Amino acid sequence: MNALKEYVCTVLLFGMAILSPLKAQSDLEIRKAFEQYGEKKGVVMVELSSEMLDGYDFSLFKSLTISNNPAAGDFIRKCLIKDEAGAKKVKQVVANGKPTSIYLQLPRKSDLYRLILFNETQKPENKITLIYIESKNDSEDILKLILKKK
């Protein structure tokens, strides 16, 4: 009977660990970008949580890097327009009438600050980066930390 209890507890803990990051973005449109492009050839998706992020004090870090796929950039921008509607702070850099860098500070979820960063460059190649971060730190502190670590 003890082995059964241990097995059930292990399965429950494992399930919670897997479902926690999935639930994190459930209310955001960018979730679709991670789902659609996360496992495509030529795309790098990174998802880190818990102890992997101790030095950064983040709860969740998720990123996509996509090369030579302008359609992905257009799709992500459409997702960001919907997420922007609920954002507390929005900053954009626009080039040739198209947002190339977007920063969204989203409303807190529980005790976590949420932040979306998007960047698209054209030269030397088309490269798209999408980052989603959850942290107990304020989004301004998160940006300072990211820029300092570089």
Regions flagged by a language model, labelled:
Residues M1-I30:
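Bacterial Sec-dependent N-terminal signal peptides
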Residues R114-E120, T129-Y132:
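Short, hydrophobic/aromatic-rich beta-strand segments within well-structured domains
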Residues K23-L112, T121-N126, S139-E140, K144-K150:
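Polybasic/polar functional segments that serve as interface/processing modules
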Residues I133-N137:
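Terminal membrane-proximal soluble interaction domains of membrane-associated proteins
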